[in-house]
Amino acid sequence: MANYYDITLALAGVCQAAKLVQQFAHEGQADQAAFETSLNTLLQIYPEDTLAVFGGKAQNLKLGLETLLEQMHGTGSDLSRYWISLLALESKLNKDPHAKAELARRIQYLPTQLEHYDLLDEQMLSTLASIYVDVISPLGKKIQVTGSTLYLQQLAMHHRIRACLLAGIRSAVLWRQVGGTKWQVLFSRRKIIAMAKQIYSSL
């Protein structure tokens, strides 16, 4: 039987990353706490459980849970495209052993770099963006990010958006690992909504 608690947390992680992409693209800034939570998921290689990936607190997924509930009710076309595309890219990643191995290799190197840089430093964001461009982008159709030209022309914003997309892939991988399937998104929305509301009400 599907564990909708874990599935919902992971899906909220995907939605949180998608929402951050939207915020950066339209506003040039994003929810800083949510951004840090999402980036930190990339460092959780051997988590104790699903919640541990997100810092052990459901509160860290507040933005993601809000976004997930909005999405399950069908609002926000850009957002829908982002998180659905992330799930699709993860599916392609899962079928590509070479890409999976390369992603694991690059991710395992991150703690070494963190000895020299903070996770939110430009150098680290550039590194995360490079992993996305080198490993994830070639797997499928490019995710077209829409927003303000003012922000989308900035290299630093490209780094933030791609770092968020990489974090979205991390949550999508987790979603698959805990039993998430596209059929649940299509046919079990009530269960996902009910669980998201239950988790959100406990924050």
Swiss-Prot record:
A Pfam family the protein falls into: DUF489
Cell compartment(s), UniProt: Cytoplasm; Cell inner membrane
UniProt-listed Gene3D superfamilies: HflD-like
GO CC aspect terms: cytoplasm; plasma membrane
Domain of life: Bacteria
Cell inner membrane keyword on record: yes
Membrane topology: Peripheral membrane protein
Keyword list, A-Z: Cell inner membrane, Cell membrane, Cytoplasm, Membrane
Protein family according to the UniProt entry: Belongs to the HflD family.
Protein name (Swiss-Prot/TrEMBL): High frequency lysogenization protein HflD homolog
Native source species: Pasteurella multocida (strain Pm70)
Gene from which the chain derives: hflD
